[in-house]
Amino acid sequence: MPEISLRHVVSGSSQDSTHCAENLLKADTYRKWRAATAGEKTISVVLQLEKEEQIHSIDIGNDGSAFVEVLVTRSAGGGGATAIEQDYEVLLVTSSFMSPSESRSGSNPNRVRMFGPDKLVRAAAEKRWDRVKIVCSQPYSKDSPYGLSFVRFHSPPDKDEAETPSQKGTVTKLGQFRVKEEDDGASSLKPGALFFSRINKTSSASARGPAGPSYAAATLQASNATSSASSVSKALGSSCKPQESPKGKRKLDLNLEDRRPASKPSAGPPTLKRPKLTVPSRSPAAAAASTPAQKAAPGKPREGTEPRGARAGPQELGKILQGVVVVLSGFQNPFRSELRDKALELGAKYRPDWTPDSTHLICAFANTPKYSQVLGLGGRIVRKEWVLDCYRLRRRLPSRRYLMAGLGSSSEDEEDDSPGESGEDEAPKLSRKRPQAKAKTQAAGPSSPQRPPTPKETKSPSPEPQDNSDTEGEQSEGQDNGAEDSGDTEDELRRVAEQREQRQPPAPGENGEDPYAGSTDENTDNEASTEADLPIPELPDFFQGKHFFLYGEFPGDERRKLIRYVTAFNGELEDYMSERVQFVITAQEWDPIFEEALMENPSLAFVRPRWIYSCNEKQKLLPHQLYGVVPQA
């Protein structure tokens, strides 16, 4: 449809000095026409066409107007530039561009509407006109001036274009933009239009053919589709069976139509790829223990049988951190806003300051005012990686792994762990921890500061080798919980006393024997075999997931001891300062370089070597704030 060219602006009731009415004549710039001041209820502009044309369609780009009306007249009709209102005929009735709520909030001010011949008044559209009057109104908002972004008039298409249907009627190119024409059946924003459209939809849905299957029939069809998919997946391997059936049950209500044609294993590739990430990392003992549990409880597919990625899908993203109220401290924009948006997207609530209902303080570094306040109140303080990892993995992670300080009770940790996650998280931990512990004890040698494996101590573990990994996992969890909470102090003291008794060697002559009267013969084969069969005691891993960097000079062999302790307790040492470093161990006083490092990585903590030694003495993770390096006053 050819565009009708505009000659000049005849008159206008109001116009801004910058956004004047002449901007509507410029086809390529898309400059706006706005009122001179805010609060005007109605503004109008009269445009002169090049010649008398029959107007077939109108394209209007809004700029804050609530209603727009288009009238037409002829300049030769006796009115001239001062034509009276009776000379104008309505071409486009008052059309809504913004609802009252949108007008008050200022949302969607630049809506574009395209009015075809069916939207125009037929009597006026069949005649030829050379002057157009556009009337805009905004009765709902008086905060900002309003107007139009552009207006385009089109004449009827040629006969050749009308005979050959083309796509130009549905997509119109306006400069560098392609504007899709509104559907003929689209309802305009009129009072009661949404209500009547809802009634029409329900009546048309009830008047359709036979009704769809009931819920029971849909369940039966989905179970048949699941059984057929599981029968085909038997040829692919037995490892796919525990993942196939829960997916069918879980996706029944969400997407039943997509599951019906799944007679061939179309869902096979995603279910086969995800277990490859978790199955190799699980130890044989954990895998053997999970197999009978899956067979014994087929009605609970969510407890350790479903892949980790399928547990928290996109539809559950807003429920991952439900019930969590976070407070931010030490972050600067734009990262602060990004972190807050991610926490809100995960379902958490945000508070600018610490309130009684707040649960977590996400702190960039220690010694901030909020940090001291929450630490005194006994709140939980975590690093920013907790929210980032939850957002990246699409599931809720235990916050105790990211604690900076604060409470760490087991009840709160149980709330952090969603059902079915503990079994899968423990299996990779145990499989990683056993070989590392053996390698560390062998590398430490006889001069290691850890407790040596005495015969009494090596007999203390359970004699059942197949349950060794599970018992070790429970012991390590007990140590972690003991390091974080203050409960079970009597059991902890009793356990430490027993360990000290086991470490103390018998005094010479205690049994009435001469220590120098023993035989110097070599051990026999039987004795050597029994000593080789004894299990190696496991070291605690309270430094797991923490990255350290040794800065500056250390007296004597202190650097070697620090490296040995950090490695023995499953910490990671970095060769240079990087973004992964969390703790900088130094024997020096505060250095101005530390301020530059804090600007780049606010989560850094500068501690003294005494913190590592104290953790080794207590055999648990102690708060590093007591051993921090702070600037001199």
From Swiss-Prot:
Residues 411-425, 467-491 have a biased composition (Acidic residues). The modification Phosphothreonine is found at T202, T454, T458, T489, T520, T524. Residues 151-172, 234-316, 407-538 are annotated as: Disordered. Gene3D superfamilies: BRCT domain, Galactose-binding domain-like. SUPFAM superfamilies: BRCT domain, Galactose-binding domain-like. The keyword Repeat applies. Residues 244-261, 300-309, 492-503 have a biased composition (Basic and acidic residues). One of its GO terms (biological process) is single strand break repair. Its main location: nucleus. Keywords: Chromosome, DNA damage, DNA repair, Isopeptide bond, Nucleus, Phosphoprotein, Repeat, Ubl conjugation. It is found in: Nucleus; Chromosome. Phosphorylation of Ser-372 causes dimer dissociation. Phosphorylation by CK2 promotes interaction with APTX and APLF. Residues 316-404, 538-629 form the BRCT domain. PROSITE patterns: BRCT. Homodimer. Interacts with polynucleotide kinase (PNK), DNA polymerase-beta (POLB) and DNA ligase III (LIG3). Interacts with APTX and APLF. Interacts with APEX1; the interaction is induced by SIRT1 and increases with the acetylated form of APEX1. Interacts with (poly-ADP-ribosylated) PARP1. This is DNA repair protein XRCC1. It comes from Cricetulus griseus (Chinese hamster).
